[in-house]
């Protein structure tokens, strides 16, 4: 929109078009009616005096996140979690820094934060892993590394892409049945390349995806799968699922005398409405 400036001369300046929440909602309904689609409230983008409204179809699914953790010693954990939704997908990342304490926390948080930024920029998981590998290798002359565990779920189709580099097995709960997924591979930052593994699965409303650090699996995967099936049958929220897993794993670790950082990150899909 062009408006006359307050100056005495006949000079005009550009002003961004502004929309209120009710106006944006009304626009979404009207454009959706024309397109015969249910649309989200549009994003308002302004650049060089031009305002653009970006409409997108409402996703079929929505993601609900939850996480819980316990440090092996003190209050510093080497595990780091990132959970967020991009315009079309739900993203969940868990990185486990080598060892425990502050050095592990630095590596874990660096890997998770950098991976999240790359994914938000549209970088594929495999390429993001290679870039994180280089970053960790150059961080210091001392050996450092972190596992990289991520899942990306398309909220329109339910297609889930999993990528693991050195990470502990994760879990999927589909149709009420839980199963472990993932094999052994090297963490990022250890070698010149990344020996990661990727997999594609299909999820739907009511399903869970769970990423855990190796400290949670001190007694194996069987009890985790059983607990997840019980939690799914009860319809527990992701935050409660994660809390139960961590508390149970912590008690088991204390009995065995092998404490480690313990973390669980949980994603549940629900109908988008």
Segment roles from a protein language model:
Residues 1-8, 12:
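Single conserved hydrophobic/aromatic residue that forms the stacking wall/gate
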Residues 6-7, 60-62, 87-91, 205-208, ...:
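Short hydrophobic/glycine-rich mini-motifs in sensory/regulatory modules
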Residues 18-77, 169:
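Regulatory cytosolic signal-relay segments
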Residues 26-49, 105-175, 249-260, 264-269:
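Catalytic core of PPM/PP2C metal-dependent serine/threonine phosphatase domains
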Residues 56-58, 267-273:
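Short beta-strand-to-coil "C-cap" segments at the C-terminal boundary of structured domains/repeats
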Residues 57-79, 129, 133-141, 168-200, ...:
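PP2C/PPM family metal-dependent serine/threonine protein phosphatase catalytic domain
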Residues 93, 164, 209-211:
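Residue-level marker for buried hydrophobic side chains located in beta-strands
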Residues 97-121, 179-180, 184-185, 190-192, ...:
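Active-site-proximal, acidic helix/loop segment immediately C-terminal to a metal-coordinating Asp/Glu
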């Amino acid at each position: 929109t062009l408006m006359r400036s307050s100056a005495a001369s006949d000079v005009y300046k550009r002003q961004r078009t502004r929309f209120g929440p009710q106006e944006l909602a009304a626009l979404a309904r009207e454009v959706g009616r024309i397109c015969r689609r249910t649309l989200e409230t549009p994003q308002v983008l302004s650049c060089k005096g031009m305002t653009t409204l970006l409409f997108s179809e409402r996703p079929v699914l929505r993601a609900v996140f939850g996480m819980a953790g316990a440090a092996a010693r003190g209050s510093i954990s080497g595990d780091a979690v990132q959970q967020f939704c991009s315009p079309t997908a739900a993203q969940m990342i868990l990185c486990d820094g080598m060892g425990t304490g502050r050095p592990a926390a630095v590596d874990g948080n660096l890997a998770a934060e950098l991976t999240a930024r790359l994914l938000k920029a549209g970088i594929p998981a495999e390429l993001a892993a290679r870039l994180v590998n280089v970053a960790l290798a150059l961080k210091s002359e001392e050996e450092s590394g972190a596992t990289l565990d991520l899942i990306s779920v398309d909220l329109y189709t339910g297609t889930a892409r999993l990528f693991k580099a050195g990470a502990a097995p994760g879990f999927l709960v589909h149709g009420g049945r839980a199963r472990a997924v993932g094999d052994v591979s090297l963490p990022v930052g250890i070698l010149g390349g990344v020996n990661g593994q990727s997999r594609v699965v299909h999820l739907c409303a009511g399903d869970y995806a769970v990423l855990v650090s190796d400290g949670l699996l001190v007694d194996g995967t069987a009890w985790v799968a059983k607990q997840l099936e019980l939690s799914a049958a009860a319809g527990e929220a992701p935050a409660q699922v994660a809390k139960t897993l961590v508390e149970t794993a912590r008690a088991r670790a204390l009995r065995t005398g092998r404490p480690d950082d313990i973390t669980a990150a949980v994603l549940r899909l629900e109908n988008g409405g």
